[in-house]
């Protein structure tokens, strides 16, 4: 089967991408680590002794980076529908985040009555090529991640998620502003310029009295 022009362009860009080359040199699993690294250097969202949950973790670049900062002091819990090779100090769950059994497995690892300090999500759906469908699927995943964050974040905790500009973006932004002290947008240099992706960083979760 002949490659499409877009896939050929992606392969050419990928093999010459400075962040791909840098990830190989520095031993990271993906170029995406530099998106999180830039946000961390600017906003200092990851600190030792934290419990961090990553949604959409495979192939593991973000979890690898977070575990390095925690350095054995704290907990790194990662989840993805795809398999992921084991990483030191990372507890990985393979399963579909949309399924209740998988979500319950995540709750079990966190522990009953326990909260987490940071939720990070780089989840994205498989694309269909139909923009409106892909946007709806993407926003559904983001909303599920936000629901989880609001259920399990400690008061003052932070939530970082990948979002694509389009239908639902403004509503999500406004909703997060009611749940967190501050909501910021971040477009790291490692995010390809033509991509519609951006990151929302919601800081200072406001936990209501239970």
Curated annotation (Swiss-Prot):
SUPFAM superfamilies: S-adenosyl-L-methionine-dependent methyltransferases. It catalyses: uridine(2552) in 23S rRNA + S-adenosyl-L-methionine = 2'-O-methyluridine(2552) in 23S rRNA + S-adenosyl-L-homocysteine + H(+). It holds the Pfam family FtsJ. S-adenosyl-L-methionine binds at residues 60, 62, 80, 96, 122. InterPro entries: RNA_methyltr_RlmE (IPR050082), RNA_MeTrfase_FtsJ_dom (IPR002877), rRNA-MeTfrase_E (IPR015507), SAM-dependent_MTases_sf (IPR029063). It is an enzyme of class 2 (transferase). One of its GO terms (molecular function) is rRNA (uridine-2'-O-)-methyltransferase activity. Belongs to the class I-like SAM-binding methyltransferase superfamily. RNA methyltransferase RlmE family. NCBIfam families: PRK11188.1 (NF008390). Its EC number is 2.1.1.166. The active site is at 162 (proton acceptor). Specifically methylates the uridine in position 2552 of 23S rRNA at the 2'-O position of the ribose in the fully assembled 50S ribosomal subunit. Gene3D superfamilies: Vaccinia Virus protein VP39. This is Ribosomal RNA large subunit methyltransferase E. It is found in: Cytoplasm. Keywords: Cytoplasm, Methyltransferase, rRNA processing, S-adenosyl-L-methionine, Transferase. One of its GO terms (cellular component) is cytoplasm.
